[in-house]
Design a protein with these regions (language model features):
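Residue-level preference for beta-strand/loop junctions
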Residues: 50, 83, 123-125
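Conserved catalytic-core motifs of GNAT/GCN5-like acyltransferases
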Residues: 38, 88-91, 103, 108-125, ...
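Acetyl-CoA-dependent GNAT
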Residues: 1-61, 72, 132-136
Length: 138
């Protein structure tokens, strides 16, 4: 286990690249990026150093192909190996595909933040999902 995994938080990033066809976003080196999964600090205080917030982004053209699940599962593995104890996902409540993805990967709904965001004049709720490494076996 890493003594202070939070110090290495920004280094946990997984990128899916496609060499076979034109699907994905064009990357800086000409590669086709299908998606990205990463972690960021959950809180700045040392007591929360082993908890991180995850984000998964999949190119529109690559959705529905298992890219998000592959990215998230690999991110979970790397985060666990890096010494993180808990992953948090904050998802806009209407993003059903991200909610399904996190539930499929073993995340549990732990709360809802009411009207914490605003987009195009509409208030948005955010649901919070959590995955605790020690209570799951992959």
């Amino acid at each position: 286990m890493v003594e202070d995994p939070g110090a290495h938080c920004s280094s946990v990033r997984i990128v899916a690249v496609n060499d076979d066809d034109e699907i994905g976003e064009l990357g800086a080196r000409g590669e086709r990026i299908l998606g990205v999964a990463l972690v960021s600090p959950f809180r700045d205080r040392p007591a929360y150093a082993t908890t991180v917030e995850n984000s998964v982004y999949v190119a529109r053209a690559a959705r529905g192909r298992g890219v998000g699940e592959a990215l998230l599962r690999q991110l979970m593995t790397v985060a666990g190996e890096s010494g993180f104890h808990s992953l948090i996902a904050r998802i806009v409540g209407e993003n059903a595909s991200s909610i399904r993805l996190h539930e499929k990967c073993g995340f549990t709904l732990v709360g809802t933040e009411i009207e914490v965001g605003r987009k195009q004049g509409v208030w948005l709720d955010v649901v919070e999902y959590q995955y605790v490494m020690s209570t799951h076996s992959r």
